[in-house]
Amino acid sequence: AANRKLKPMAEYEQLDENFDKAELTSKLSNLYVQMQDCWQKKDISPIRPYCTDAFFTQMDNQLQRKKQQGQTNYIERIAVLSVELRGWCQEGGNDVLVARLNTRIVDYTLDDKTGKLISGSRDKEKFMVYEWDLVRTTGTKTEKDKPMQTVNCPNCGAPVEINASAKCPY
């Protein structure tokens, strides 16, 4: 996005009357947590609809290597600290919205057989910044009242508050 001339999001909202910045930022927070959860489970198929072919293939190849090496990447204390919609542009018949996510995780890899720490830290927090390009065909309108998939605690089913520690309070 560095070389793109981005238009303000207010202009995009005028093109799509159902577009809601707050709803999109919430969806992006949820998607980030889902992506980390899928990565740790070594099954990224649930997030396939949200990825380009190239990005999905890259992640899948990395996961296959982890499986072959007998390693699991653990991602804990996930928090999306902020989501900023930076702007939008049109490229090749698509609307491209640019979002920046500021996140925090604890990230480490263990050997599946021995439990030995391979890389990372079980305690040290990593602060990460991601820039995501969200792409859809120019002219596509936001569907009103489309339900959003949320993240729930795998143990008790309670909804996980994305902007908190992503640890179940129940």
Question: Where are these predicted regions, by residue range?
Answer:
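Mixed-charge, low-complexity intrinsically disordered segments
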Residues: 112-122
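Surface-exposed, charged secondary-structure patches
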Residues: 69-113
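Short cysteine-rich clusters marking metal-coordination/redox-active sites
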Residues: 153-156, 168
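Cys/His-rich microdomains that often coordinate metals
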Residues: 157-164
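Short flexible coil/turn linkers enriched for glycine and charged/polar residues
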Residues: 41, 90-95, 125-128, 147-148, ...
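Cys/His-rich Zn2+-binding cysteine-cluster or related metal-binding knuckle/ribbon modules and their
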Residues: 142-151
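Core segments of small alpha/beta cavity-forming domains
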Residues: 2-76, 165, 169-170
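Hydrophobic/aromatic beta-strand elements that line small-molecule binding cavities or substrate pockets
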Residues: 83-85, 130-134
